Amino acid sequence: DTAQTANWRTDPAVAAGGYFEDLASHGLDLMLHLLGDITLAQGIRTNQQGLYAAADAVTGTWQFASGATGSGYWNFGAAQALDAVTIHGSQGEIHFSVFGEQPVVLRNAQGTQSHEIAHAENIQFFHIENMQKHMDGLVTHPSTSHTAQRTTWVMEQISRPPF
């Protein structure tokens, strides 16, 4: 964000972690859902652009309980917006976007498969509807206070000062 306009996401009094606090939780929550608990996380955050008070660049590294490692980089002042996740495995890789309507691409020894997953027009509606069904005991929703706490812990570890 290089607009230099007042924005709750860039005001540390409202959102201490800036855009990272608002947006990174979604991708990190998805990583926890797909790959399991993260047991170690650390990071670096800084304000490179000086356009607002919150950090605009964050780098994080983490380790899953399985031993797999991961890393992420969020730069909210970059010239080009990029929303991409790549999971590299011993037999191939999967590539997808957290927010964008990009195809999910699987590459392995058998070739490349690409799948379009259209976003619902009102994605929050289905999330809220399924949370209500969860609270009524009708279904088990994958997003709970426990998963939110895990994601928050990872973000706090990435965001905290190194010393």
Regions picked out by a protein language model, each given a short descriptive name:
Residues A65, M131-F163:
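C-terminal helix-rich "cap/oligomerization" subdomain common to oxidoreductases
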Residues L23-H26, I123-F126, H146, R150:
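A generic structural signal for residues located within well-ordered alpha-helices
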Residues D1-I44, Q48-L51:
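Predominantly a Rossmann-like dinucleotide-binding segment in NAD(P)-dependent oxidoreductases
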